[in-house]
Amino acid sequence: MKLTILGCFSATPRKDANPTAQVLEINNHLFLIDCGEGTQVELRRNKIKFARIRHIFISHLHGDHFFGLVGLISTFRLLTRETELHIHCPKGLKEVITLQMKLADSWTNYPLYFHELTSSDSELIFEDGKVEVWTIPLDHRVYTNGFLFKEKEGERHLHMPSVIEANIDMAYYNKLKQGCDVLNKDGVLIDHLKVTLPPNPPKSYAFCSDTAYKEDIVPIIKNVDVLYHESTFLEKNANLAPKTKHSTAKEAALIAKMANVKTLILGHFSTRYDNLNEFKREAETIFKPVELASDGKFFDFD
């Protein structure tokens, strides 16, 4: 599981930073999460192949989280993309993007699907044989979801000395890895648990931005490997958080602690702050380990 931060600051422009966007690579999927201005430039800068992006997840309809989307959709057209693109987003985004394309008389030459979200409950919005994606209902000034990405349990591993000793034909190796008992060459039924090892623990990642402090999300993100939680403010400006529906670094750490996550990443920093290490120090009074997002930063959680 790998995470690339393309942008991690809040809405106000800053010459050395971009608004929210990140790419999660999990089990051969490349998921784009939010798409603020400058996203496609950062994709190029970080050498991420556009064609591998087939699913985009938009948390909410504030511009710093989706103003880069129509440009990216247009670039896909210029690159003669043929692969379908799925956008998981709040209701209303399809109307916005369609109007922009209509006024420009610039339509896609590839299948474009909008999966618009309206539920206030956590729901499964994507699933295949390897990965699930769930919404995380957040508390912001407009309808907002975070996203929980979860690997499904993978195949078991062969313990080759035991497999050879059990006299099992190679043709049955895949069945063993899938958790099936098989007949050996002598016609004896072999328990797969005796010749295989458990699969690698499935990885999980939760993206929570933008949101006020909300303990209701704790059961949804319980025990995740990595939590990205917005921390727009430091505690010295905590009075600004409730009225803007954002969180402080301390509040993000409290959520991480209650949810028993393994690693907390802080992001969505207000541009009023120059020293981001203050966010880390504040959060570490509650929870460790804490990482700070920064544009172009790469996390490898394998």
Regions found by a protein language model. Name each.
Residues 4, 88, 113-118, 134-136, ...:
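General small-molecule cofactor/ligand-binding pocket signal
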Residues 38-88, 116-118:
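Active-site metal-binding motif and surrounding structural segment of the metallo-beta-lactamase
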Residues 69-76, 274-282:
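Metal-dependent catalytic neighborhoods of phosphoester/phosphodiester hydrolases
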Residues 118-266, 277-286, 302:
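Metal-dependent phosphodiesterase/nuclease catalytic metal-binding core
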